[in-house]
C-alpha cells in the first residue's frame, strides 16, 4: 500500500467547498467538528454557522444566533459576502473587510436541491468566488448518501471526506470518480479498489480525504490522505 499520509489542516485552500459522506453514526459530524476545532486553533476561522434540521451536535458552535434549522437564512450570509467582495475591490488594503467564515450544512442536501433552495451546485461552482482574499468562506456539506449530492458538486469540491460506503452503487461511483483516475486498466482498477478497502479498515472511525483541488497527481499519495479525530479536545456531551 502506498504511503498515505495524515491530513494536514494547513493545506486546506483559503476558501473551500467540502463534502462529507458517511452513514449515520459513523463519526462524520465529530470529525467535521474536529476539523473546525483545528481550523480555529490555526487561526483560520472568525465565524462559524451551522445549518441543521435537528440542531444537534457541533457543540463548538455555542452561539444560538449562529445555529439555524432553516436553510433560507444561508442566503443572507451569501449576499453579505457578495457585497463585501465588491466593496473590497474599490477600497484600499487597510480598509478591506477581512472575515473568515465556516458554514456547515448537516444533512440538508435535500432542501438545497429543492426548487426553493436550488443552490448546492451554485455553491460548488461559484461559492469560492464570493470570498476573494482577505475574505474566506469554507462550506462543509454533510450527507448520509452520496446520491443526494449532485455529481457536479462532487467533481467541483475541494475535499471529499468519507469512510466505509455500504452501498455498492455509491462505492462504484466513488471508485470511478476518484480511485481509477491514475490507471483505468483492469489491474489499475483492482489496485485502486484494494487501496480504498485498505484505507477504510486501517483504524476505527478513520476517514479517507480526497483532495480534488490537487493538480498534476502522479500517485495516490499526491491526493489521498487519512483523517481521524482526537476526541479528547472536543466537548461531546
Where are these regions (language model features)?
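Active-site regions of enzymes building and remodeling cell-envelope glycoconjugates
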Residues: 61-76
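Short, structured coil segments at secondary-structure junctions
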Residues: 44, 61-64, 155-156
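Conserved P-loop NTPase motor cores
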Residues: 16-38, 53-56, 72-188
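Conserved GTP-binding G-domain of TRAFAC-class P-loop NTPases and closely related GTPase folds
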Residues: 151-237
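Post-Walker A helix-loop "phosphate-sensing" segment adjacent to the P-loop in P-loop NTPases
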Residues: 37-48
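A domain-level signal for caspase-like cysteine endopeptidase catalytic cores
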Residues: 49, 60-61
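Pre-Walker A adenine-sensing motif
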Residues: 1-13
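Short, hydrophobic beta-strand segments that form beta-sheet elements in well-ordered domains
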Residues: 46-53, 67, 139-143, 209
Amino acid at each position: 500500500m502506498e504511503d498515505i499520509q495524515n491530513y494536514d489542516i494547513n493545506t486546506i485552500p483559503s476558501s473551500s467547498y467540502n463534502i462529507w459522506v458517511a452513514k449515520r453514526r459513523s463519526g462524520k459530524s465529530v470529525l467535521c467538528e474536529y476539523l473546525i476545532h483545528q481550523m480555529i486553533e490555526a487561526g483560520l476561522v472568525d465565524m462559524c454557522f451551522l445549518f441543521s434540521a435537528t440542531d444537534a451536535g457541533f457543540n463548538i458552535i455555542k452561539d444560538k444566533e449562529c445555529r439555524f434549522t432553516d436553510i433560507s437564512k444561508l442566503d443572507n450570509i451569501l449576499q453579505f459576502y457578495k457585497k463585501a467582495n465588491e466593496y473590497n475591490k474599490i477600497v484600499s488594503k487597510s480598509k478591506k473587510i477581512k472575515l473568515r467564515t465556516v458554514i456547515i450544512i448537516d444533512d440538508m442536501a435535500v432542501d438545497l436541491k429543492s426548487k426553493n433552495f436550488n443552490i448546492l451546485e451554485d455553491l460548488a461552482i461559484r461559492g469560492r468566488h464570493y470570498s476573494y482574499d482577505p475574505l474566506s468562506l469554507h462550506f462543509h456539506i454533510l450527507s448520509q448518501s452520496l446520491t443526494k449530492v449532485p455529481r457536479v458538486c462532487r467533481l467541483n469540491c475541494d475535499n471529499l471526506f468519507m469512510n466505509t460506503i455500504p452501498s455498492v452503487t455509491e462505492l462504484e461511483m466513488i471508485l470511478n470518480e476518484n480511485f481509477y483516475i491514475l490507471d483505468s486498466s483492469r489491474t489499475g482498477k483492482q489496485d485502486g479498489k484494494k487501496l480504498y478497502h485498505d484505507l477504510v479498515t486501517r483504524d476505527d472511525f478513520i476517514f479517507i480525504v480526497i483532495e480534488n483541488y490537487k493538480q498534476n497527481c502522479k500517485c495516490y499519495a499526491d491526493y489521498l490522505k487519512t483523517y481521524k479525530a482526537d476526541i479528547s479536545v472536543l466537548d461531546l456531551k
